[in-house]
């Protein structure tokens, strides 16, 4: 076979850059606080390493943050060991996106089933967007300028939900 032409190589470089930029746009929208805490160089390096290392099996772009997070969790060593809270915090940010983008139409859900007219035979239904998680780091307070230095003595558990008016 003939070696790829310079023109084909240039096209591949442009295509790779377009796909990488698209990949990064999904990461940037899912992990905005992580991105603001890490240096631009750290975030860029993490994004590039993940882009090169991930072998995604889903064609859906909306799955990119989940696939990225799974990849990061499977790394044999913490990717950025100077941020021991990073994985938990990124999971928390991702969980917020999962809840926000859940397909449930909350305004159409009756939260008492099956017989609303008989309160003694009714029971509450959980919000379908409900996600539960426990973390050792105070992920709910983490932000630029407020970085924890040690894990909490006990895990904090969260119920993340979307309300009807969200």
Question: Could you tell me what each predicted segment is?
Answer:
Residues 1-13:
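Charged, compositionally biased N-terminal leader segments and the immediate start
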Residues 11, 19, 23, 30, ...:
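Alpha-helical structural motif
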Residues 12-19, 31-32, 52-56, 166:
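A ubiquitous short alpha-helical element
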Residues 52-166:
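Hydrophobic packing positions characteristic
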């Amino acid at each position: 076979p003939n070696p790829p032409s310079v023109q084909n190589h240039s096209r591949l470089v442009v295509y790779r850059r377009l796909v990488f930029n698209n990949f990064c746009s999904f990461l940037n929208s899912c992990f905005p606080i992580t991105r603001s805490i890490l240096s631009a160089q750290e975030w860029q390096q993490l994004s590039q390493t993940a882009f090169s290392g991930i072998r995604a099996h889903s064609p859906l772009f909306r799955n990119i943050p989940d696939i990225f997070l799974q990849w990061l969790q499977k790394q044999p060593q913490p990717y950025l060991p100077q941020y021991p809270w990073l994985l938990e915090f990124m999971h928390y940010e991702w969980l917020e996106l999962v809840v926000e983008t859940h397909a449930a139409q909350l305004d159409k859900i009756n939260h008492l089933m099956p017989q609303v007219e008989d309160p003694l035979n009714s029971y509450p239904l959980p919000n379908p967007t409900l996600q539960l998680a426990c973390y050792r780091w105070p992920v709910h307070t983490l932000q630029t300028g407020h970085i924890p230095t040690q894990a909490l003595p006990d895990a904090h558990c969260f119920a993340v939900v979307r309300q009807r008016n969200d």
